[in-house]
Regions:
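Aromatic-anchored, glycine/proline-accented short structural segments
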Residues: 184, 191-244
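Multi-pass membrane catalytic core of lipid/isoprenoid biosynthesis enzymes
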Residues: 75-82, 98-148, 223-246
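Small-residue-rich segments of transmembrane alpha-helices in multi-pass membrane proteins
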Residues: 47-57, 111, 171-187, 232-235, ...
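Membrane-interface helix starts
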Residues: 39-49
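Cytosolic, membrane-interface loops and tails of multi-pass inner-membrane proteins
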Residues: 7-32, 90-117, 211-234
Length: 246
């Protein structure tokens, strides 16, 4: 039987990316570092940002009694906006975490710490994505636009949260579930308590899944001095996660 050598991995392939993802296989080589900054090779995060938007839109439609043509645009606009804002947010995160990422096994091959993209180019890419998302936001009503601008605050704070609190996942939850409020307001032009309660439930959901995700980095995180719920809760994680679902 002939000896078969394993296929070499692309030297810039990110450790936590899916094998043979469309970015590594189909995207033009020049675009790959930028697409990876936006996590286009790992779409699960986009879904985690988009689903709360669609939840908010759904209860907004139920609140008004029937869907309107504008709700279809909100549905589509939220989908495109989730891709763009996740990309812009991840780029912002990587710009600020570049020194930490260089010391963590899972993240050291990301575009900025690996040298594939300069900080200046990453900043331009972040702004470009944010401006495209802004164009979509400005097609919504005034209440949604105001909420969209308020969302900049938790997005801006999140990369620094792991430096000053054991609960950075809470800040991620605030940012990632903001779409519940925004999409509901885009459909109804106001907010209600059921919408706010759903938003709070979404934050709890994010605490659940991102604490699990953080466990893969907890040894490296402890060494470089950053905080997370995975480190804080340690062996008690399962009990706390169960409580978060109640």
């Amino acid at each position: 039987m002939p000896h078969l050598e394993p296929l070499p991995e692309a030297k810039d392939q990110i450790f936590d990316a899916v094998d043979n993802n469309w970015v590594d296989v189909h995207a033009p080589i020049w675009s790959r570092p930028f697409l990876k900054l936006s996590r286009m090779d790992r779409p699960i995060g986009t879904w985690l940002l988009l689903l709360p938007c669609w939840w908010g839109l759904l209860i907004g439609i139920l609140n008004t009694g029937s869907p309107k043509l504008n709700d279809l645009w909100i549905f589509v606009g939220c989908a495109v906006g989730a891709v763009l804002m996740r990309g812009s947010g991840c780029t912002w995160n990587d710009i600020n975490d570049r020194k930490i990422d260089a010391k963590v096994a899972r993240t050291k091959l990301r575009p900025i710490p690996s040298g594939s993209v300069s900080v200046k180019k990453a900043a331009f890419w972040m702004v470009a994505q944010a401006l495209m998302a802004l164009f979509i936001l400005l097609t919504f009503n005034t209440t949604a636009i105001i909420l969209g601008f308020i969302a900049i605050l938790p997005v801006a704070i999140y990369p620094f949260a792991k430096r000053f609190t054991w609960w950075p996942q809470f800040f991620l939850g605030i940012a990632f579930n903001w779409g519940v409020l925004l999409a509901f307001a885009a459909s109804t032009n106001f907010l209600t308590w059921p919408c706010i309660i759903l938003y709070l439930a979404g934050i709890s959901w994010t605490l659940f899944y991102d604490t699990i995700y953080a466990h893969q980095d907890k040894e490296d995180d402890a060494l470089v001095g950053v905080k997370s719920t995975a480190i804080l809760l340690a062996d008690s994680t399962k009990s706390w996660l169960f409580i978060s679902l109640l």
